[in-house]
Amino acid sequence: MTAQAALATAANDGELRHDWSAEEIEALFALPFNDLMFEAQKVHRAHFDANRVQVSRLISIKTGSCPEDCSYCPQSAHYATGLEKEKLLAVEEVVESARQAKEEGASRFCMGAAWRGPKGDDFEVAVAMIEGVKALGMETCATFGLLDKWQAQRLKEAGLDYYNHNIDTSPEHYSEVITTRTFQDRLDTLDVVRDAGLHVCSGGIVGLGETRTDRARMIQTLANMPKHPDSVPINLLIPIQGTPLADAERPDSFDFIRTIAVARITMPKSFVRLSAGREGMTEEMQALCFLAGANSVFCGQKLLTAKNAAPGKDKSLFGKLGLQPM
């Protein structure tokens, strides 16, 4: 399969595909950089205003002591990263954070918790948080780990709009990164979320020691879901001392930008989020990511426990590029 053949069937005309082969997607990755950027921008402009970016804020509502062993995560109880465990935040504190985020230009407020999955009273507190944030007129998003059908429906009734559950990497590379839950566990939770009528937010991480084929397989898995994720976060690994990936080699910047572009081409109507890792990117790299089809970012100085681009930097960058928040 040539890249030209793959592009001929890409969704420039509004028809969404769910039958991408790994070979087609690898052919897109292999395009000359300028050609790939041009094609991604064409697809982007067919479905979005290329100069508008959706802005979200993400906070950790419960930090540390997670029982999972995700080898990139400082919140895992399996690793000594020096992260201080924090109990579940109070509802009022979360709602106030959301209010501040709205004042700073965020339209969506995302809440993350270091759980395998929500349980008991903690779940009900999280439900109250969602209700409180929704009352501010913001879109709501949560990432609480594995969900069952009842929990997903309860979150929907509380006013949750989006549920994030990343697949992280390819099915083949997954067990090299995480062993405490399976790739299928993640897909099952996404099915539950979709069936409850929630918008799906799901993407992955570049820099986990994966190959280009792994990146293609990750994109293939996302693009071939029954419905494309409404939001596709593409993260650049932030190496954290104490985790197994602390000394992981930083991916080539152009490989990361290619991943953004291929996600845009294969999932034309999805928001592609330039997610974790922006703090370590130059303005020029971020600009190329927007040119490749990224149209969503997280604002605020932290993403859960990781550093993020400060609001002032984003305002400056948006001004230089002529971008406007949605």
UniProtKB/Swiss-Prot annotation:
What does the record note about the cofactor? Binds 1 [4Fe-4S] cluster. The cluster is coordinated with 3 cysteines and an exchangeable S-adenosyl-L-methionine.
Q: In which pathway does it act?
A: Cofactor biosynthesis; biotin biosynthesis; biotin from 7,8-diaminononanoate: step 2/2
- What keywords is this UniProt entry annotated with? 2Fe-2S, 4Fe-4S, Biotin biosynthesis, Iron, Iron-sulfur, Metal-binding, S-adenosyl-L-methionine, Transferase
Positions binding [2Fe-2S] cluster in this chain are: 110, 141, 201, 273
Q: What is its EC number?
A: 2.8.1.6
Q: From the UniProt record, which GO molecular function terms apply?
A: 2 iron, 2 sulfur cluster binding; 4 iron, 4 sulfur cluster binding; biotin synthase activity; iron ion binding
Does Protein transport show up as a keyword for this record? no
Which Pfam families does the annotation name?
Answer: BATS, Radical_SAM
Known cofactor(s): [4Fe-4S] cluster; [2Fe-2S] cluster
What are the Radical SAM core domain coordinates in residue numbering?
Answer: 51-278
Q: Which residues bind [4Fe-4S] cluster?
A: 66, 70, 73
Give the family from UniProt. Belongs to the radical SAM superfamily. Biotin synthase family.
Please give the subunit comment from the record: Homodimer.
Q: What is this protein called?
A: Biotin synthase
Taxonomic lineage from the root: Bacteria, Pseudomonadati, Pseudomonadota, Alphaproteobacteria, Rhodospirillales
